[in-house]
């Protein structure tokens, strides 16, 4: 029982960290493009996990037979998910993206039921998820009725959601094969960085720099780089995103998925907007509105329903 509570705290820690990433990323966007942040973040994470592996000794990953899993994890959980979400925000508004992506846990549950041995899909889980989605909508819209269908961006947001669902299924596959989560995550980061190389080259060209308001720009100007990389706050945010939000959180997420199952673990993602609102209020001085409080309460009720059974918490 104690170990389950400890693992539950692990989920809470990941949610808190991921809830803060929005503010950290927003601070870095003053000096860096979205793509540059992505590369810096996962490069640092890969180096950190590689160093830990060397200190612990090489882990058995089954030679090359598991590489397709790592490559697929890198593509679905990092490259496709991050790119689709960033592009979706460009073509639609942030509220649309937040609401559409919040359907992720239900989609993940459906995928898990169809493709894995995970059978946690139930009426309570679906009902709780729908209640949580209503809460996310209240927090995201915050009294401004601005949800309108914008096909290109909305489809991208839905694809991002589906991509994360596939990543969750791949985590389950890696766990079923007994692969060390640290190894699986580190290798998936490596594959994602390899896949980003063509985008990085394109980002140095004029068309790449101008695309999506500079979201994919890669700045090679020495003067600009000296200035932005000499900023201590930038390094603190990069370290947070790379070491905590990527290296530590992705490994811990894989561990708790092994213990609780990908469906129940993914339900906890509904709590991320609550953390984001609280962090913005405490550290950025933003006001918390009545709708955000109500929305947060609705999310908590939905999560409680989705993660319990008649006899109590699963």
Enumerate the language-model features and the residues they cover.
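Glycine-/small-residue-enriched transmembrane alpha-helix faces in small-molecule transporters
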Residues: 1-39, 75, 147-176, 194-201, ...
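Specific alpha-helical transmembrane segments that line the substrate/conduction pathway
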Residues: 36-47, 76, 85-124, 129, ...
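Juxtamembrane helix-entry segments on the extracytoplasmic side of multipass membrane proteins
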Residues: 3-8, 31-35, 39, 62-68, ...
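Transmembrane alpha-helical segments that form core, pore/gating elements
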Residues: 49, 108-110, 146-219, 252
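Specific transmembrane alpha-helical segments of multi-pass solute transporters/efflux pumps
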Residues: 17, 21-22, 50-101, 134, ...
């Amino acid at each position: 029982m104690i170990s389950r509570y400890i693992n539950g705290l692990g989920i809470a820690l990941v949610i808190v960290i991921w809830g803060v990433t929005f503010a950290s990323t927003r601070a870095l966007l003053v000096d860096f493009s979205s793509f540059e942040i992505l590369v810096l973040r996962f490069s640092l994470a890969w180096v950190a996990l590689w160093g830990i592996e060397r200190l612990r000794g090489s882990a058995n990953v089954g030679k090359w037979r598991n590489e397709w899993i790592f490559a697929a994890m890198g593509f679905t959980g990092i490259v496709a998910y991050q790119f689709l979400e960033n592009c979706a925000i460009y073509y639609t508004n942030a509220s649309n993206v937040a609401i559409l992506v919040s359907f992720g846990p239900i989609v993940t549950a459906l995928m898990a039921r169809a493709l894995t041995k995970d059978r946690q899909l139930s009426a309570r889980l679906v009902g709780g998820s729908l209640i949580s989605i209503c809460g996310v909508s209240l927090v995201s819209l915050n009294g401004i009725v601005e949800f309108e269908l914008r096909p290109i961006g909305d489809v991208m947001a839905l694809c991002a959601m589906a991509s994360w669902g596939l990543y969750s299924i791949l985590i389950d596959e890696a766990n079923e094969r007994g692969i060390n989560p640290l190894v699986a995550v580190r290798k998936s980061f490596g594959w994602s960085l390899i896949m980003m190389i063509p985008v990085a080259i394109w980002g140095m060209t004029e068309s790449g720099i101008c695309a999506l308001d500079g979201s994919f720009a890669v700045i090679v100007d020495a003067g600009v780089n000296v200035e932005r990389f000499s900023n201590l706050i930038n390094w603190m945010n990069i370290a947070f995103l790379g070491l905590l939000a990527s290296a530590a959180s992705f490994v811990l997420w894989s561990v708790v998925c092994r213990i609780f199952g990908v469906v129940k673990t993914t339900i906890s993602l509904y709590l991320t907007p609550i953390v984001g609102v609280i962090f913005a209020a405490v550290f950025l001085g933003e006001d918390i509105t009545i709708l955000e409080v109500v929305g947060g309460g609705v999310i908590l009720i939905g999560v409680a329903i989705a993660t319990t059974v008649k006899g109590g918490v699963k």
